[in-house]
């Protein structure tokens, strides 16, 4: 089933709730506006933002590129969105959650309502202690957020969403680019790691490219018991037979 009319759910009340769900001390985006500054005159700001979104006049700002150091010493690029972009993104995430929570599989734990890292670890622990598994494959999709194919992201969103206004919003965020040291650059692939919308898009993408494939593989190809736990782009399949896990490595 596709949903053809969704934008009307993006109300001022939803935008207000989205604003107050944001981190108060988060770094500002390219416009330099902090959460506290945006809260000043909030109702007028939200009325204006709501109007621009529904008139098609809303423009997504580029993300501000920052880097954090990874455990191995390499730099991980993050994209810091402007407050207004975060508000609209969170509102759209809330709407999309109502649709995709009906679709997402049980072994997906990352960035979902009512689910957490602790639950993923509990599922992993339970499988190791209670299930008949002897091997564990710890898989991480390399540079996943940076390398996402934008056209396929849109195609996967379109499986359930047929409201062109929602699709245009997603396209605006994917194509907003990044600002680094005052210079704008286009992002030909990927979605900014650190943005509000990215985890939702990642889960939709992986639902169709990984989760559904794993379900078929587990039922038709695997010999013995196979348990899968996925948290965003990290997964940990566990099985009784090593050769079955080695065949699953081809996916990653």
Specify the residue positions occupied by each region the protein language model found.
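Short, compositionally biased low-complexity segments
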Residues: 9-27, 63-67, 93-99, 177
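Duplex nucleic acid-engaging cores and interfaces of nucleic-acid transaction enzymes
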Residues: 84, 88-93, 135
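Conserved phosphate-binding loops in nucleotide/dinucleotide-binding enzymes
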Residues: 77-78, 82
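Electropositive, glycine- and tryptophan-enriched low-complexity nucleic-acid-binding patches
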Residues: 90, 94-109
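Glutamine-centric residue-chemistry signal
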Residues: 75, 89-90, 193
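Conserved polymerase palm-domain catalytic core
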Residues: 45-48, 52-66, 71, 103-115, ...
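Surface-exposed loop/turn segments and immediately adjacent short secondary-structure elements
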Residues: 1-55
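Residue-level detector of well-ordered alpha-helical segments, enriched
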Residues: 2, 14, 18, 45, ...
């Amino acid at each position: 089933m596709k949903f053809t009319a969704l934008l009307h759910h993006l109300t001022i009340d939803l935008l207000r709730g989205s604003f107050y769900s944001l981190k108060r001390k988060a770094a500002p985006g390219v416009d330099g506006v902090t959460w506290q500054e945006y809260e000043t005159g909030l109702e007028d700001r939200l009325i204006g933002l709501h109007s621009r979104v529904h008139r098609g006049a809303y423009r997504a700002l580029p993300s501000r590129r920052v880097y954090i150091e990874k455990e191995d010493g390499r730099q991980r690029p993050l994209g810091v969105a402007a407050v207004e972009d975060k508000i609209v993104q969170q509102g759209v995430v809330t709407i999309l959650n109502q649709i995709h929570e009906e679709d997402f599989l049980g072994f997906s734990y990352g960035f979902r309502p009512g689910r957490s890292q602790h639950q993923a670890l509990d599922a992993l622990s339970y499988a190791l202690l209670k299930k008949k598994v002897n091997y564990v494959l710890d898989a991480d999709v390399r540079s996943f957020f940076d390398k996402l194919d934008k056209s396929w992201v849109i195609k996967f969103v379109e499986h359930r969403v047929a409201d062109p206004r929602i699709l245009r919003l997603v396209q605006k965020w994917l194509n907003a680019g990044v600002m680094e040291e005052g210079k704008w650059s286009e992002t030909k692939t990927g979605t900014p790691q650190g943005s509000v919308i990215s985890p939702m898009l990642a889960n939709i993408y992986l639902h169709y490219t990984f989760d559904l494939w794993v379900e078929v593989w587990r039922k038709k190809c695997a010999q013995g018991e196979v348990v899968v736990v996925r948290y965003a782009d990290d997964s940990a399949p566990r099985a009784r037979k090593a050769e079955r896990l080695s065949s699953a490595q081809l996916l990653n």
